[in-house]
Amino acid sequence: MTEKEKMLAGELYDCGDAELLALWHRAKDLARDYNLTNSSDTKRKSELLNELLGKVGNQLWITPPFHVDYGCNIYFGNNCEVNMNCTFLDDNKIIIGDNVLIAPNVQIYTAYHPTHYLDRFTISENETFNFCKTQTAPVIIGKNVWIGGGTIILIGDNTVIGAGSVVTKDIPADTIAYGNPCKVHKANERSKSI
C-alpha cells in the first residue's frame, strides 16, 4: 500500500513520502497563484480552482487567501462561498454540500497525530528533516450550512455553527450549535420546511 493510499484510508502514513511531497508542492504553487491572481480575473481564478480542487461545483466563490495541503481531496457542491483566510488541510476528503457559506478564518483539518511522541516521530541521527507520522479522517459538511469564523467541523444538513466554535464531533442536521466545545443549543426550526 502506498503512503497516499494509507493517508486516504486513515492509516498512519509518512508525510515525507516523495509522491505526497510532489502533490503538496503542486497544491502550494497553485494556491499561491490563485491567491496572487487579480481579484477581477475570474476566468484565471476559475481555471486555477479547477486544476487545484477535486471538484468545483457551479457558482463557487473563494476569497483569497485560501490555503490547502493537497487541494485534490476537496469537493465543493454548487453555490458555495468561502471567505478570506480559510485553511483546508485535506489529507483526506473534505466534501462540502450545496449552498454552504464559510466565514473568514475557518480551519478544516482532516489530519491528526498519535498522542505518544514515539508514535509520531522516527528519530534518526542524520541531518534530514523527519516528518511526523499522521492519520486522517474525512470531513463532510452537509448542504445549506453556514459556518461562522474559526471552526473545525463534521456537521449535518441545514446547520448553523457559531463563530469561534471548536467542533470535535458530529453535529446533527437542522440544528444551531456553538461554543468550545461546540454543542447543539436549539433546533433550526425553519430549515425543516426546506
Where are these regions (language model features)?
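Short-chain dehydrogenase/reductase
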Residues: 61, 146, 160, 176-178
